[in-house]
Amino acid sequence: MAGETTKLDLSVKAVGWGAADASGVLQPIKFYRRVPGERDVKIRVLYSGVCNFDMEMVRNKWGFTRYPYVFGHETAGEVVEVGSKVEKFKVGDKVAVGCMVGSCGQCYNCQSGMENYCPEPNMADGSVYREQGERSYGGCSNVMVVDEKFVLRWPENLPQDKGVALLCAGVVVYSPMKHLGLDKPGKHIGVFGLGGLGSVAVKFIKAFGGKATVISTSRRKEKEAIEEHGADAFVVNTDSEQLKALAGTMDGVVDTTPGGRTPMSLMLNLLKFDGAVMLVGAPESLFELPAAPLIMGRKKIIGSSTGGLKEYQEMLDFAAKHNIVCDTEVIGIDYLSTAMERIKNLDVKYRFAIDIGNTLKFEE
């Protein structure tokens, strides 16, 4: 993390919610944050988003969760204190923190403005800072202390409760489309899956001036996709006639389903010459990769994970300008365990946001 290299004063008392071990039992966890340094911003957390990633981290699915674990990589709040050299923010500003709270700042990726691909990142929930050895704890807590570089300005006309999930779902789909030039009017983009990521992807595509076609496993969400989210068309992925008619018509396809579930051949067949498949769903297994469609159509497959700081801010500003928010159920902290079970059972439309400011009690 950019900033001081002296020993930190970890004396800011904090409380968050998370897990003490991989059992998945959620509970209040008391811990300490650092005293704000000269370039730090102290934030009173008001809302924290919850998604499937948090549930998997709580249970240590990938084997790198550090306990005690306080989750939260979608955080919105207000500034309550700033360091002496902070230039971007003042007390009272609405702000946000995404998936990252630090990076090396020196590598090619960081220098290119893509801090999310830094080989030594400081993630918001559970990293150890390279220089100081400080643990990071997520935003599902009463307070955060973050280097100003990694604090985002929150647009005034964007509601924090409905917008906080954009810090994950929004940037995950915005970044690859922006990178590939699919943010231009007239582009035809297919969206596989209509969950938290897919529903937001459709909203961004329409705001870009593009055509959005949702591809799903059943017609259950057809009315919702078209009437609520503005999709131009809806296709069932087993309808061979519909798929045949769409072959070679799309500039891009964004796959928001868990990686490997959607046949790659199906997605590649929908693409125009020079089209791209964007993988943003975490892969659960290996998948077959047909080479002929790639070679004969100069098609490409890219993966993407969140976005750099510049992209984060651009995404929030764009969302505010076009009134893009996530379909969100706002809950109190006491409902968190139930919310996690509902996420596991796919029983949420489409995101949860915890009202931290009004429901997380902090006692010295």
Swiss-Prot record:
Tissue expression remark: Expressed in leaf epidermis.
Loss of function: phenotype: Accumulation of ajmalicine at the expense of catharanthine and vindoline production. Lower tabersonine-forming activity.
Pfam family membership, one: ADH_N
List of residues binding Zn(2+) 1: 51, 73-74, 168
GO molecular function, one term: geissoschizine dehydrogenase activity
Impact reported for residue 53 to T: Abolished activity
Enzyme class at the top of the EC tree: oxidoreductase
EC number: 1.3.1.36
Pathway info: Alkaloid biosynthesis
Assembly mode: Homodimer.
The name this protein goes by in its record: Geissoschizine synthase
Gene: GS
